[in-house]
């Protein structure tokens, strides 16, 4: 009598979880092995100090890679001075401490003026440090970005950074599975950023809480790796710690030839495994959300939460449109903070600053998209500052080889050095109170880009068009 093998269909998340499960605990949590640990200057100092105080060494040196990004200056003159060019004392100390700790613990680092330096979530995939099938963590909430490569990736806190350094493992509770499927074809001028903003508008910033989100459907099948990274990057803004896309030929072609990617026989073996990294037919999802690509237009956030977003052709919503009292109260506060009126057309919002960059939209595809809009045109007179900040030294280098820097500079943009920049008020790139900024970043919370600053989340193409007009415009007709 032959044995009968019953194979249960699994989601991608389940496959990755099971492949890295070390042990299950009585309290319902599990011990998970971590393949790649990305470090930066803000959440690592206390972790390294904890290691030193306990007289421990990192468990697996090769699994760790560091680069400064949050606090680094983006102005070239200051950048050329290295760490000493950082004006803020605390920021300077954090970057210096990262350098010192990496030397002390023998951890590889792309230092401030290494051409490979950049935003950690741009550098990881770009260098082939993040590969399909990996578990990836970093002391930063936008680590979900790496899920675009078919990884289980999420942010961790400082105490967890120390735990991973010391043990290469992490105690976690398993999430539920959510599938977000977008079928159809995106219209001209509609990008990955618009897709993820539309998703957040639909499910809300708490919609993905407790879930690992897998993005699937024709839109993602046809989307570039850069676009997939943009979408997975903002899974956290939808409430989920994890966002991911199954592996396909687009993934494998992106990874091929990267500096730290496998080669030869190891490459062939890796590809064979990577091709299994997709959800099985019939796999169970605890929640399924569907969108039609033809319904998605260029998006603009109007308020102080990523879910406060509408099509550029629409208006600031009125209180009468609020679904409940809680939402109405949040909208009222947002009207006041943002200096906007109910029913105000989005295209009437005048802008003071433009920021093209961040771990969401600072890759070469993003810069090409923005450059195609501004070519031969000039930034509007009412825009005080428009800056472009590449996500890494290598993205910047490639953009310069393609002549994109000249297009931006001729239009009136500033061409900056790589870093997190104006995404968050932790470096010299900040908004002044009451300034409106069209930003390609991921969060529009109160004070996110500077005390009293007013952030509007958009795609690179929409930000570029807004810079030229001095207010929001529909890039499809610009």
Curated annotation (Swiss-Prot):
PROSITE patterns: ACONITASE_1, ACONITASE_2. GO terms for biological process: L-leucine biosynthetic process. It catalyses: (2R,3S)-3-isopropylmalate = (2S)-2-isopropylmalate. Its cofactor is [4Fe-4S] cluster. It comes from the Bacteria. Coiled coil: none annotated. NCBIfam families: leuC (TIGR00170), PRK05478.1 (NF004016), PRK12466.1 (NF009116). This is 3-isopropylmalate dehydratase large subunit. The gene is leuC.
């Amino acid at each position: 009598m032959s044995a009968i093998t019953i194979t249960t269909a699994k989601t991608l998340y389940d496959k990755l979880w099971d492949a890295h499960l070390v042990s299950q605990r009585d309290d319902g949590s599990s011990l998970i092995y971590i393949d790649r640990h990305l470090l930066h200057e803000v959440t690592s100092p206390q972790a390294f100090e904890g290691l030193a105080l306990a007289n421990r060494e990192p468990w697996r040196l090769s699994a760790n890679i560091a680069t400064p990004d949050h606090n680094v200056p983006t102005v070239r003159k200051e950048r050329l001075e290295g760490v000493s060019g950082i004006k803020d004392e605390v920021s300077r100390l954090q970057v210096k401490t990262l350098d010192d700790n990496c030397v002390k613990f023998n951890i590889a680092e792309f230092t401030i003026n290494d051409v490979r330096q950049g935003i950690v979530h741009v550098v990881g995939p770009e260098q082939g440090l993040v590969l399909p099938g990996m578990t990836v963590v970093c002391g930063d909430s936008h680590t979900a970005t790496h899920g675009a490569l078919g990884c289980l990736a999420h942010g961790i806190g400082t105490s967890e950074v120390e735990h991973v350094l010391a043990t290469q493992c992490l105690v976690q509770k398993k999430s539920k599975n959510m599938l977000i499927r977008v079928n159809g074809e995106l219209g001209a001028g509609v990008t990955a950023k618009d897709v993820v903003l539309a998703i957040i508008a639909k499910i809300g910033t708490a919609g993905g809480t407790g879930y690992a989100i897998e993005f699937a459907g024709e839109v993602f099948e046809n989307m570039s790796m850069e676009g997939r990274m943009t979408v997975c990057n903002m899974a956290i803004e939808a409430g989920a710690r994890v966002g991911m896309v199954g592996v396909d030929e687009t993934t494998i072609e992106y990874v091929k030839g990267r500096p730290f990617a496998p080669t030869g026989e190891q490459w062939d073996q890796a590809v064979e495994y990577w091709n299994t990294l997709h959800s099985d037919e019939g796999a169970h999802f605890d929640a399924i959300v569907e969108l039609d690509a033809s319904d998605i237009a260029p998006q603009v956030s109007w308020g102080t939460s990523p879910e406060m977003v509408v099509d550029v052709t629409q208006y600031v919503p009125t209180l009468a449109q609020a679904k409940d009292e809680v939402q109405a109260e949040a909208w009222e506060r947002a009207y006041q903070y943002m200096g906007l009126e109910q029913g105000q057309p989005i295209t009437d919002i005048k802008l003071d600053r433009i920021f093209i960059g961040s771990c969401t939209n600072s890759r070469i595809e993003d810069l090409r998209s923005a450059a195609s809009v501004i070519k031969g045109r000039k930034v509007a007179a009412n825009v005080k500052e428009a800056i472009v900040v590449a996500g890494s030294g290598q993205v910047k280098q490639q953009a310069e080889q393609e002549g994109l820097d000249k297009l931006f500079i001729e239009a009136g943009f500033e061409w900056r050095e790589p870093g997190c920049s104006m995404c968050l008020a932790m470096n010299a790139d900040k908004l002044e109170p009451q300034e409106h900024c069209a930003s390609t970043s991921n969060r529009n919370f109160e004070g996110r880009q500077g005390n009293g600053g007013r952030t509007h989340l958009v795609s690179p193409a929409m930000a570029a068009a807004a810079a030229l007009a001095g207010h929001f415009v529909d890039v499809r007709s610009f």
